[in-house]
Amino acid sequence: MGDTIIVIPARYGSTRLKAKVLEQLDGKSIVEHVWRAAKAAGEGKVLIATESPVIVEHCAKFGAQAVLTSEACQSGTDRIYEAVKNGSEDYVLNLQGDEPFVKPQTIKGVIKLLKKDSKIDIATACYPTFNDDIYKNPNAVKAVLTKDMRALYFSRSAIPYKRELTEETKKAPYYIHCGIYGYKKTALERFVNLPPSNLEKLEKLEQLRALEDGMVIKSILIEAAGPAIDTAEDLNEARKYIRNN
């Protein structure tokens, strides 16, 4: 698996919930949960990239390798590129540090898709839902996908809109995007050298930069997992999820 590296960007100065990756869930920090899932996938080297010595020190306590990156990184993708740009790997997985419920099989599935399809630049994962509360939540990013799972758009808005509620349209799920990206190394380099795009700045979704530049993103489908952690409310929901599962 020497052609693949998994990088977990873990920012101490996160905007909505500072130091969220250090918050405890079921006796382990959020970032440790993510790291353990990455190690269990067995798909290559696992590295944590952070701007904080506090996180580096914390990661050492549970045996993870962490590297310091610049505080000037504008996004998690910039951070992972700084960590891997001089490496020899052909495939780079960006596994966001606030996804404590990510499953090893999801990681394996994204990497498998990335390696088998020569036409795609980025692989990711989505899950179907019929839950209106999730669909209408701007923190749950919606994906519009073609029949062959190519991404047409990502949005915080409730899309696609069902203009008529028929028996047929009721059976059509919405797709929620998960915080995992597999990049071909060449695509990652191309991405970080692009300026932020107009749609990206409107939605605050960096994957739109790739779409606007014509890059091909495809997704695997997975079962819904527990929540990603963006806010204090999400953290409370995550703790409830652990108690109930």
Curated annotation (Swiss-Prot):
<dbReference type="InterPro" id="IPR029044">
    <property type="entry name" value="Nucleotide-diphossugar_trans"/>
</dbReference>
<keyword id="KW-0548">Nucleotidyltransferase</keyword>
<keyword id="KW-0808">Transferase</keyword>
<dbReference type="GO" id="GO:0009103">
    <property type="term" value="P:lipopolysaccharide biosynthetic process"/>
</dbReference>
<dbReference type="InterPro" id="IPR004528">
    <property type="entry name" value="KdsB"/>
</dbReference>
<dbReference type="Pfam" id="PF02348">
    <property type="entry name" value="CTP_transf_3"/>
</dbReference>
<comment type="pathway">
    <text>Nucleotide-sugar biosynthesis; CMP-3-deoxy-D-manno-octulosonate biosynthesis; CMP-3-deoxy-D-manno-octulosonate from 3-deoxy-D-manno-octulosonate and CTP: step 1/1.</text>
</comment>
<comment type="similarity">
    <text>Belongs to the KdsB family.</text>
</comment>
<comment type="pathway">
    <text>Bacterial outer membrane biogenesis; lipopolysaccharide biosynthesis.</text>
</comment>
<dbReference type="GO" id="GO:0008690">
    <property type="term" value="F:3-deoxy-manno-octulosonate cytidylyltransferase activity"/>
</dbReference>
<protein>
    <recommendedName>
        <fullName>3-deoxy-manno-octulosonate cytidylyltransferase</fullName>
        <ecNumber>2.7.7.38</ecNumber>
    </recommendedName>
</protein>
<keyword id="KW-0448">Lipopolysaccharide biosynthesis</keyword>
<dbReference type="InterPro" id="IPR003329">
    <property type="entry name" value="Cytidylyl_trans"/>
</dbReference>
<keyword id="KW-0963">Cytoplasm</keyword>
<dbReference type="GO" id="GO:0033468">
    <property type="term" value="P:CMP-keto-3-deoxy-D-manno-octulosonic acid biosynthetic process"/>
</dbReference>
<comment type="function">
    <text>Activates KDO (a required 8-carbon sugar) for incorporation into bacterial lipopolysaccharide in Gram-negative bacteria.</text>
</comment>
<dbReference type="GO" id="GO:0005829">
    <property type="term" value="C:cytosol"/>
</dbReference>
